[in-house]
A protein has these predicted regions:
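Bacterial Sec-dependent N-terminal signal peptides
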Residues: 1-24
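Alpha/propeptide regions of enzymes that mature by internal proteolysis
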Residues: 19-171
Length: 171
């Protein structure tokens, strides 16, 4: 776990010290792979490399969007979509199961400048909950939707809906 923090610090440092951004506002990207415990003693070198590569790729996605003058919201959404789509992390595919053996997902987004916010909670079928949270912020009068109402809203918004089996992976 210590190596992950070191990698994140190095990546943030390289983002803020890039000569291509002279005269522009510096930025950093900080990510994590979800809640839970991953013990180094239980991880092979190959497995650790897989986790590190996925985390690094997620940061690169957001970095490239910002580097190309993209929107911060898009950088956050695409970075988190990547993590949600990876079975290695506890966000989206690969999530921890409830006591009933199902997956319930939460996501939230806030724009620090405007203070606009959107969130979804206890969703079961939205492939990328962060995208649903952003849709709540942009396309509804609400700040948060939960459960079936949030799943229905996401479907109405054209987001990808998947079966519960999509999220369940072997660990």
């Amino acid at each position: 776990m210590k190596k992950i923090y070191i990698l994140i610090a190095i990546i943030i440092s390289s983002c803020t010290n890039n000569k291509n951004f002279e005269g522009k506002i510096n930025f950093g990207i900080v990510i994590h792979g979800g809640a839970g415990t991953i013990l180094k003693k239980n991880m092979t070198e190959e497995m650790e490399r897989m986790y590190m590569n996925q985390l690094e790729e997620a940061v690169k996605i957001g970095y490239q969007i910002i580097k190309n003058n993209g929107d911060g919201k898009d950088a956050v959404e695409k970075t988190i979509n990547y993590l949600e789509d990876s079975p290695l992390f506890n966000a989206g595919k690969g999530s921890v199961l409830t006591n009933e053996g199902t997956v319930e997902l939460d996501a939230s987004f806030m724009n620090g400048k405007s203070l606009d916010a959107g969130a979804v909670a206890s969703v079961k079928f939205i492939k990328n909950p962060i995208s649903a949270a952003i849709k709540v912020m942009k396309n509804s009068p609400h700040v948060m939707l939960s459960g079936k109402g949030a799943d229905d809203f996401a479907k109405e918004q054209g987001l990808e809906i998947v079966d519960q089996n999509y999220f369940i992976t072997e660990r």
